[in-house]
Amino acid sequence: MRAGLSIVLSILFFCNLNAQVANEADFKKKFALVDGYLFDGDYIKALPISKELYNYDSTNANVAYMLGTSYLGADPDRKIAIRYLEQAVGNVSLMYKEGDYKEKTAPGITYYNLAKAYHFAYRFDDAISNFYNYRSFIDLEDAKTYNEVKRQIEYSENAKLLIEQPVNIKVQSLGPVINSQYEDYSPVISADGNTLIFTSRREGSTGGKLFYDGKYLKIFIFQ
Protein backbone atom coordinates (compact mmCIF):
# COMPACT_ATOMS: atom_id res chain seq x y z
CA MET A 1 0.00 0.00 0.00
CA ARG A 2 2.83 2.35 0.94
CA ALA A 3 4.65 1.51 -2.30
CA GLY A 4 1.50 2.18 -4.30
CA LEU A 5 1.06 5.55 -2.59
CA SER A 6 4.66 6.47 -3.38
CA ILE A 7 4.10 5.65 -7.05
CA VAL A 8 0.95 7.80 -7.15
CA LEU A 9 2.74 10.72 -5.47
CA SER A 10 5.65 10.37 -7.89
CA ILE A 11 3.28 10.45 -10.86
CA LEU A 12 1.48 13.53 -9.51
CA PHE A 13 4.81 15.29 -8.91
CA PHE A 14 5.98 14.43 -12.42
CA CYS A 15 2.72 15.70 -13.95
CA ASN A 16 2.90 18.96 -12.00
CA LEU A 17 6.52 19.40 -13.04
CA ASN A 18 5.60 18.88 -16.68
CA ALA A 19 2.71 21.36 -16.36
CA GLN A 20 5.05 23.95 -14.91
CA VAL A 21 7.56 23.52 -17.74
CA ALA A 22 4.76 23.62 -20.31
CA ASN A 23 3.47 26.89 -18.86
CA GLU A 24 6.95 28.39 -18.85
CA ALA A 25 7.50 27.28 -22.44
CA ASP A 26 4.17 28.82 -23.44
CA PHE A 27 5.08 31.99 -21.56
CA LYS A 28 8.43 32.15 -23.35
CA LYS A 29 6.76 31.74 -26.75
CA LYS A 30 4.10 34.39 -26.12
CA PHE A 31 6.63 36.73 -24.54
CA ALA A 32 8.67 36.59 -27.76
CA LEU A 33 5.54 37.37 -29.80
CA VAL A 34 4.65 40.41 -27.70
CA ASP A 35 8.26 41.60 -27.69
CA GLY A 36 8.29 41.46 -31.48
CA TYR A 37 4.92 43.17 -31.87
CA LEU A 38 5.94 46.01 -29.56
CA PHE A 39 9.21 46.43 -31.44
CA ASP A 40 7.21 46.72 -34.68
CA GLY A 41 4.67 49.06 -33.08
CA ASP A 42 1.84 46.57 -33.65
CA TYR A 43 0.07 47.25 -30.36
CA ILE A 44 -3.24 45.78 -31.48
CA LYS A 45 -1.71 42.33 -31.88
CA ALA A 46 0.37 42.71 -28.73
CA LEU A 47 -2.56 43.61 -26.47
CA PRO A 48 -4.48 40.31 -26.18
CA ILE A 49 -1.30 38.27 -25.73
CA SER A 50 0.00 40.76 -23.16
CA LYS A 51 -3.19 40.18 -21.19
CA GLU A 52 -2.48 36.44 -21.20
CA LEU A 53 1.05 37.02 -19.91
CA TYR A 54 -0.24 39.29 -17.16
CA ASN A 55 -2.87 36.78 -16.10
CA TYR A 56 -0.08 34.21 -15.83
CA ASP A 57 2.26 36.45 -13.80
CA SER A 58 0.63 39.66 -12.54
CA THR A 59 3.58 40.52 -10.27
CA ASN A 60 6.07 40.70 -13.16
CA ALA A 61 7.05 44.35 -13.77
CA ASN A 62 8.25 43.56 -17.29
CA VAL A 63 4.89 42.01 -18.19
CA ALA A 64 3.08 44.98 -16.62
CA TYR A 65 5.23 47.25 -18.80
CA MET A 66 4.28 45.24 -21.90
CA LEU A 67 0.57 45.32 -21.10
CA GLY A 68 0.59 49.01 -20.24
CA THR A 69 2.49 49.84 -23.41
CA SER A 70 0.05 47.76 -25.46
CA TYR A 71 -2.92 49.62 -23.98
CA LEU A 72 -1.19 52.94 -24.57
CA GLY A 73 -0.75 52.19 -28.26
CA ALA A 74 -3.88 50.19 -29.04
CA ASP A 75 -6.74 51.38 -26.87
CA PRO A 76 -8.51 54.69 -27.63
CA ASP A 77 -8.89 55.15 -23.87
CA ARG A 78 -5.16 55.33 -23.14
CA LYS A 79 -5.81 56.03 -19.45
CA ILE A 80 -6.21 52.27 -18.96
CA ALA A 81 -2.44 51.98 -19.42
CA ILE A 82 -1.73 53.99 -16.26
CA ARG A 83 -2.54 51.16 -13.83
CA TYR A 84 -0.05 48.78 -15.39
CA LEU A 85 2.69 51.31 -16.09
CA GLU A 86 2.50 52.61 -12.52
CA GLN A 87 3.04 49.05 -11.37
CA ALA A 88 5.96 48.63 -13.76
CA VAL A 89 7.85 51.77 -12.68
CA GLY A 90 7.91 50.35 -9.18
CA ASN A 91 10.61 47.97 -10.38
CA VAL A 92 12.58 49.71 -13.13
CA SER A 93 16.22 48.66 -13.51
CA LEU A 94 19.28 50.06 -15.26
CA MET A 95 20.38 46.44 -15.65
CA TYR A 96 17.25 45.51 -17.63
CA LYS A 97 17.85 42.71 -20.15
CA GLU A 98 15.89 43.41 -23.30
CA GLY A 99 14.22 40.41 -24.95
CA ASP A 100 14.83 38.08 -22.00
CA TYR A 101 11.61 36.31 -20.99
CA LYS A 102 13.06 35.69 -17.52
CA GLU A 103 13.52 39.42 -16.94
CA LYS A 104 11.12 40.59 -14.23
CA THR A 105 12.17 44.24 -13.98
CA ALA A 106 10.96 46.97 -16.33
CA PRO A 107 13.02 49.12 -18.74
CA GLY A 108 13.67 52.82 -18.22
CA ILE A 109 11.36 53.75 -21.10
CA THR A 110 8.48 52.76 -18.83
CA TYR A 111 8.76 56.25 -17.33
CA TYR A 112 8.31 57.77 -20.79
CA ASN A 113 5.26 55.65 -21.58
CA LEU A 114 3.71 56.40 -18.19
CA ALA A 115 4.31 60.10 -18.80
CA LYS A 116 2.48 59.82 -22.13
CA ALA A 117 -0.43 58.05 -20.45
CA TYR A 118 -0.60 60.76 -17.77
CA HIS A 119 -0.61 63.41 -20.49
CA PHE A 120 -3.60 61.78 -22.21
CA ALA A 121 -5.35 61.70 -18.81
CA TYR A 122 -4.69 65.46 -18.33
CA ARG A 123 -2.37 64.74 -15.39
CA PHE A 124 0.26 67.07 -16.76
CA ASP A 125 2.36 67.53 -13.60
CA ASP A 126 2.69 63.76 -13.28
CA ALA A 127 3.55 63.57 -16.98
CA ILE A 128 6.30 66.18 -16.68
CA SER A 129 7.74 64.48 -13.59
CA ASN A 130 8.00 61.13 -15.35
CA PHE A 131 9.48 62.62 -18.51
CA TYR A 132 12.25 63.98 -16.28
CA ASN A 133 12.61 60.57 -14.64
CA TYR A 134 13.13 59.02 -18.06
CA ARG A 135 15.89 61.49 -18.96
CA SER A 136 18.20 59.82 -16.43
CA PHE A 137 18.06 56.66 -18.59
CA ILE A 138 19.02 58.41 -21.83
CA ASP A 139 22.56 57.99 -23.14
CA LEU A 140 24.43 61.30 -22.99
CA GLU A 141 25.25 61.01 -26.70
CA ASP A 142 21.62 60.31 -27.70
CA ALA A 143 20.68 63.88 -28.59
CA LYS A 144 17.68 62.78 -30.67
CA THR A 145 15.94 61.04 -27.77
CA TYR A 146 16.89 63.81 -25.35
CA ASN A 147 15.36 66.46 -27.62
CA GLU A 148 12.23 64.36 -28.13
CA VAL A 149 11.70 64.12 -24.36
CA LYS A 150 12.33 67.85 -24.05
CA ARG A 151 9.64 68.46 -26.68
CA GLN A 152 7.18 66.19 -24.83
CA ILE A 153 7.80 68.15 -21.63
CA GLU A 154 6.99 71.36 -23.52
CA TYR A 155 3.77 69.76 -24.84
CA SER A 156 2.67 68.91 -21.29
CA GLU A 157 3.59 72.37 -19.99
CA ASN A 158 1.64 74.03 -22.83
CA ALA A 159 -1.34 71.71 -22.33
CA LYS A 160 -1.40 72.57 -18.63
CA LEU A 161 -1.55 76.29 -19.47
CA LEU A 162 -4.33 75.74 -22.01
CA ILE A 163 -6.41 73.85 -19.44
CA GLU A 164 -5.82 76.54 -16.81
CA GLN A 165 -6.63 79.31 -19.31
CA PRO A 166 -9.34 77.84 -21.59
CA VAL A 167 -10.33 79.52 -24.84
CA ASN A 168 -13.96 79.81 -25.92
CA ILE A 169 -14.64 77.88 -29.12
CA LYS A 170 -17.64 77.21 -31.34
CA VAL A 171 -18.31 73.59 -32.32
CA GLN A 172 -19.65 73.17 -35.85
CA SER A 173 -20.40 70.02 -37.86
CA LEU A 174 -18.24 69.55 -40.95
CA GLY A 175 -20.90 67.47 -42.69
CA PRO A 176 -21.45 63.73 -43.25
CA VAL A 177 -18.10 63.21 -44.98
CA ILE A 178 -16.27 64.09 -41.77
CA ASN A 179 -18.85 63.59 -39.01
CA SER A 180 -20.48 60.16 -38.83
CA GLN A 181 -23.07 58.50 -36.59
CA TYR A 182 -20.20 56.59 -34.98
CA GLU A 183 -17.46 57.75 -32.61
CA ASP A 184 -15.12 60.28 -34.24
CA TYR A 185 -12.43 61.74 -32.00
CA SER A 186 -8.81 62.86 -31.42
CA PRO A 187 -8.73 65.42 -34.28
CA VAL A 188 -5.39 66.97 -35.21
CA ILE A 189 -4.83 69.86 -37.64
CA SER A 190 -1.58 70.13 -39.60
CA ALA A 191 0.65 73.16 -39.03
CA ASP A 192 -0.49 74.76 -42.31
CA GLY A 193 -4.16 74.23 -41.41
CA ASN A 194 -4.89 72.25 -44.59
CA THR A 195 -5.01 68.68 -43.28
CA LEU A 196 -7.36 67.11 -40.72
CA ILE A 197 -6.43 63.78 -39.10
CA PHE A 198 -8.75 61.94 -36.70
CA THR A 199 -9.74 58.52 -35.39
CA SER A 200 -13.11 57.00 -36.31
CA ARG A 201 -15.01 53.86 -35.30
CA ARG A 202 -17.27 54.12 -38.35
CA GLU A 203 -18.43 51.00 -40.13
CA GLY A 204 -16.18 49.50 -42.78
CA SER A 205 -12.87 50.86 -41.51
CA THR A 206 -9.85 48.71 -40.57
CA GLY A 207 -10.23 46.85 -43.84
CA GLY A 208 -13.62 45.57 -42.75
CA LYS A 209 -12.11 43.85 -39.68
CA LEU A 210 -13.30 44.53 -36.14
CA PHE A 211 -11.02 45.83 -33.40
CA TYR A 212 -10.68 43.73 -30.24
CA ASP A 213 -13.59 45.63 -28.61
CA GLY A 214 -15.95 44.62 -31.42
CA LYS A 215 -15.88 47.98 -33.21
CA TYR A 216 -14.07 49.29 -36.26
CA LEU A 217 -11.02 51.53 -35.91
CA LYS A 218 -9.20 53.64 -38.47
CA ILE A 219 -7.31 56.91 -38.79
CA PHE A 220 -8.79 59.20 -41.47
CA ILE A 221 -6.92 61.97 -43.27
CA PHE A 222 -8.77 64.77 -45.09
CA GLN A 223 -7.35 67.72 -46.99
Regions of interest found by a model, annotated:
Residues A25-Y56:
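Alpha-helical segment of the N-proximal tetratricopeptide repeat
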Residues G99, E103-A106, T110-N113, F120-Q223:
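Short, conserved micro-motifs composed of acidic
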Residues D40, A74-D75, A121:
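Structural motif corresponding to the intra-repeat A-B loop/turn of tetratricopeptide repeats
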Residues Y43, D77-R78, F124:
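TPR-repeat structural position
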